Amino acid sequence: MKRILFVFGLMMLTVSMASAQQKEASIAVLESEVHDFGDIDAKAGPVTHTFKIKNEGEVALVVTKVVASCGCTSPDWTKEPIASGKTGEIKVTFNPENRPGPFTKTVSVYSNGKTGSYVLTIKGNVTTN
């Protein structure tokens, strides 16, 4: 009888711990997922936009990887964990050199957040005046 109660108690403890862990999650909220640079002069050099990412979850948000869709686009991001209620940054730089005309580029963001991944988009038009 003691053995049955012990096993039952252990099972209940495991279930309660599992449900408590499910409640704790990082929730990444982005101010925007798309940025339009408008017209960019190719001779002006690279342009940068900073996307803000806020952690509205209970545990620290960690952006684990950020991948650009093209070599003309380079990302930089907050590497340290983003505490609950705090905001981090994902800076995306586009180099318009030798790329005249309209463009749309994406950056994939991976994290420990509830959603897991996001796609950010930058777009614009490179002019050669």
Ranges and model annotations:
Residues 44-50, 99-106:
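Short, solvent-exposed loop/turn segments enriched in Ser/Thr/Gly
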